[in-house]
């Protein structure tokens, strides 16, 4: 299978170690972190589930039937892959109704467990989560010694905050379609496809900017006019000049350099950084036209991603790796820096 991610640079050089990911669902475990407590009362029935072999939307539809409501009355914070063991909360709008008995629901769906239920005064919405915790078993490693060194590098310095291959579709089809749409080769009314192609377009441009900074050795080095964020904050500020103090803050991870999620408004960068980003974006005029035609607004995303709570344990030629990532970040971008996947490996939809 064509891996469009091969177009983008590795931070620590392309690994020589090969291995397999997710031969079985239990080799890939994902646990959602909402980051807030429930009220314990309210119109919304909250259900924590563990699922294997089922995707989130299927579970939502089946849970709606069990609760006697429409699927539109059931919501979630993030979609989780079917080819994994995943835990997440789902909310069901049940105003004035008692908590339903889910015994039959569980009995009829052997791939779904109900771990916990409670009540809340608000429904879950897509994006209502802090992040996800992952446990991944990487199997049949051909060079465990190299992988051990790369694990230390990743824990210390992080990985490129790339959007993963699943964002771009099989063989990059979502990007190909986005270019054609931007060139007015077809009209598109399907809301789901519009969202896929627009997300792919912005993600592709971000990855191109990030990859070029790695290639030129500037992923950790300030440019005049860079748009920066303090660690853990969303607000940006401009690097009007390069100072030793500011560069030291970047080296320590206290300040992050960002790259664009392109919109129809002007880039917030200036001087060298603005010229650098504009030159790369100009290479994809059809994607830029598509984004502007759809009036998407500019956002920023950090260049580097540092996994939290990162631990690992070798087991022969396998390694069990665990870490936490913020919402919107890809576990596959971490794994990509560690090994080259063997044929037969599968990807999880883990971007939410």
Swiss-Prot record:
Q: Which reaction does it catalyse?
A: uridine(13) in tRNA = pseudouridine(13) in tRNA
User: Per its UniProt record, what PROSITE patterns does this chain match?
Assistant: TRUD, UPF0024
Pfam families documented for this protein: TruD (PF01142)
Gene Ontology annotations of biological process type: tRNA pseudouridine synthesis
Broad enzyme group: isomerase
The UniProt keywords, alphabetically, are:
Isomerase, tRNA processing
Q: Which residues form the active site?
A: 81 (nucleophile)
Give any GO molecular function from the UniProt entry: RNA binding
Q: Which domain of life is it from?
A: Bacteria
* EC nos: 5.4.99.27
A single Gene Ontology CC annotation of this entry is: cytosol
Task: List residues of the TRUD domain.
Answer: 158-306
Family (UniProt): Belongs to the pseudouridine synthase TruD family.
Q: Which NCBIfam families does this chain map to?
A: PRK00984.1-4, tRNA_TruD_broad
Q: What does this protein do?
A: Responsible for synthesis of pseudouridine from uracil-13 in transfer RNAs.
- Please identify the protein, giving its name as recorded: tRNA pseudouridine synthase D
Originating organism: Photobacterium profundum (strain SS9)
| Gene name of the record | truD
